Swiss-Prot record:
This is Serine hydroxymethyltransferase 2. It comes from the Bacteria. Its EC number is 2.1.2.1. Pfam families: SHMT. The lineage of its organism: Bacteria, Pseudomonadati, Pseudomonadota, Alphaproteobacteria, Hyphomicrobiales. (6S)-5,6,7,8-tetrahydrofolate binds at residues 121, 125-127. Its main location: cytoplasm. Pathway: One-carbon metabolism; tetrahydrofolate interconversion; Amino-acid biosynthesis; glycine biosynthesis; glycine from L-serine: step 1/1. Homodimer. GO terms for cellular component: cytosol. Keywords: Amino-acid biosynthesis, Cytoplasm, One-carbon metabolism, Plasmid, Pyridoxal phosphate, Transferase.
């Protein structure tokens, strides 16, 4: 995809070379990391635009710098489009990331030392939901809830017992490796019973909500955060939504000046483009296909004897428990990488292995679905994964990885990215 900016990079061979090789990697490998996707050329163009030159502290119509009339149009468009997508009366599109969005909510609603609850990282939550090494785990009294060992589904009874015992000011739900629908109404009832606010982090499934294949938490929670990449297929960034005007005022102040200075206007421009794309009818089909593909992949692996955490998926991701195969997540990630299948090692609930090793892998469908993969292709991908991992540690390992790599090459050639067919 050569263009003006690529040509300009010829004067910096180090960066130009790295970008070219990364483009080659993305074109020639099947991306199965659940948090990654393939943005459109329009999103790339917006993020690489002159909007990056503009400082714009403040909000549309209320900036601390002159010359903001055009960035105001861009940010207003992003806000309007997000509000339409998620039925939200208030949207802040300035957070630089999902972690920044979550931090802004905590700054808005909590004081240091306050108690809040979040799904534990070990159960599929996110670092920012109270993991000890993070700001959320150090500045606040973070009480973690988990999943049942019997089925790896959220233990709502445990959540309720802990909420009654600790009286949190905020209950957070959502996660980074939880493949099932969450009972938002049950958590809302628990939060109401103890006087807590409810926050949903929909970073992973925002695109599914936008596409109408997942319940909309904005209708239930006091406040919702998300990233704009992953299933939403936009640039890397964050966003906060609510229909509670009291919360909205606190959030705006928490984002700026509380947590951030100038917003990244080139990224907000790209967010606006991606949100516009998500309003189109074909995005709804894309969302449906992500879920159908994830279920096809889960079924293909189950047929080959692989254990899928929780028994399946309702979303774009699956978590594979490799213990019965005697393979670590680390070794699986490396072997699949050699075969051109990019994924990440991931802890499973009640994982006996350390985080740098893990007993599982996380697989997602957003990027390959953007390439055009459907169920048939994901059935093939599931077979390739099983072939590689079944042979791992045997004398057939190298040959299976080579064969898988050839199949990956053929699939990528049939479904190219950033070409005339994209």
């Amino acid at each position: 995809m050569p263009g003006l900016f690529e040509r300009q990079l010829k004067h910096d061979s180090v960066i130009a070379g790295a970008i070219a090789r990364e483009m080659g990697r993305q074109r020639s490998e099947i991306e199965l990391i659940a948090s990654e996707n393939i943005v459109s050329p329009a999103v790339l163009a917006a993020q690489g635009s002159v909007m990056t030159n503009k400082y714009a502290e403040g909000y549309p119509g209320h900036r601390y710098y002159g010359g903001c009339q055009y960035v105001d149009l861009v940010e207003a468009a992003a806000i309007e489009r997000a509000g339409m997508l998620f039925d939200a009366s208030f949207v802040n599109v300035q957070p630089h990331s999902g972690a920044q969005a979550n931090g802004a909510v905590m700054l808005a609603l909590l004081k240091p030392g306050d108690t809040f609850m979040g799904l534990s990282l070990a159960a599929g939550g996110h670092l920012t939901h109270g993991a000890r090494p993070t700001m959320s785990g150090k500045w606040f009294n973070a009480v973690q809830y988990g999943v049942r060992e019997s089925d790896c589904l959220i233990d709502y009874d445990e959540l309720e017992v802990k909420a009654i015992a600790t009286r949190p000011k905020l209950i957070i739900t959502g996660g980074s490796a939880y493949p099932r629908l969450i009972d938002f109404k049950r958590i809302r009832a628990i939060a109401d019973s103890v006087g807590a606010a409810m926050m949903v982090d929909m970073a992973h499934f925002a695109g599914l909500v936008a596409g109408g294949v997942h319940p909309n938490p904005v209708e239930i929670a006091d406040i919702v955060t998300t990233t704009t990449h992953k299933t939403l297929r936009g640039p890397r960034g964050g966003m906060i939504l609510t229909n509670n005007q009291d919360v909205a005022k606190k959030v705006n102040s928490a984002v700026f000046p509380g947590l951030q200075g100038g917003p990244l206007m080139h990224v907000i421009a790209a967010k606006a483009v991606a949100l516009g794309e998500a309003l189109e009818d074909n995005f709804r089909q894309y969302a449906r296909q992500m879920v159908a593909n994830a279920r096809a992949l889960a079924s293909a692996l189950t047929e080959r004897g692989y254990d899928i955490v929780s028994g399946g998926t309702d979303t774009h991701l699956i978590l594979v428990d490799l213990r019965s195969k005697g393979v670590s997540g680390k070794d699986a990630e490396e072997a699949l990488g050699r075969a051109g299948l990019t994924c990440n090692k991931n802890g499973i609930p009640f994982d006996p292995a350390p985080p740098a090793v893990t007993s599982g892998i996380r697989l997602g469908t957003p990027a390959a679905t953007s390439r055009g993969f459907r169920e048939a292709e994901f059935n093939e991908v599931g077979a390739l994964i099983a072939n590689v991992l079944d042979a791992l540690g045997t004398e057939q390992s190298g040959e299976q990885e080579r064969r898988a790599r050839m199949s990956v090459h053929d699939l990528c050639a049939a479904f190219p990215i950033y070409s005339a067919r994209h």
